[in-house]
Amino acid sequence: MGVERYLLVALGGALGSLLRYGLGAWVQGSLGAGFPWSTLFVNALGSFLIGLTLRLSLEGALSGEARLFLAVGVLGGFTTFSSLSYETLALLQGGEVGKALLYAFGSLFLGLLLAFLGYRLGGALVG
């Protein structure tokens, strides 16, 4: 694997992290504290976009380099499982068991659903 591929992933990851920070700050500022809305939003959007991106890649509508940049780089930097884990733990430690369970399982369900919908949309766009 050439150094160019690593650079694509690194640049995409930097872009994805910047997008997560900016969009996350806007979402949390808009919806308020008390629930990790920003992480839920970026992970849900990222799940949809990874489904779409990977389907387009599988159908040949994206090159291998575009897939690396978008799926591994941008969306890898955009989504965050570690924040989901930490925020769930913080809710549990704060005694908010119901919120923690809703957040953890809701995030998983929403992520899977949106990845599926993105995948289906990708198929419809090229099929």
UniProtKB/Swiss-Prot annotation:
It is found in: Cell inner membrane. The chain crosses the membrane at residues 7-27, 31-51, 68-88, 97-117. Its main location: membrane. It is a multi-pass membrane protein. GO terms for cellular component: plasma membrane. GO terms for biological process: cellular detoxification of fluoride. InterPro entries: FluC (IPR003691). Keywords: Cell inner membrane, Cell membrane, Ion channel, Ion transport, Membrane, Metal-binding, Sodium, Transmembrane, Transmembrane helix, Transport. Na(+) is not transported, but it plays an essential structural role and its presence is essential for fluoride channel function. It catalyses: fluoride(in) = fluoride(out). Signal peptide: none annotated. Na(+) binds at residues 76, 79. GO terms for molecular function: fluoride channel activity; metal ion binding. PANTHER family: FLUORIDE EXPORT PROTEIN 1-RELATED (PTHR28259:SF1). Belongs to the fluoride channel Fluc/FEX (TC 1.A.43) family. Fluoride-specific ion channel. Important for reducing fluoride concentration in the cell, thus reducing its toxicity. This is Fluoride-specific ion channel FluC. The gene is fluC.
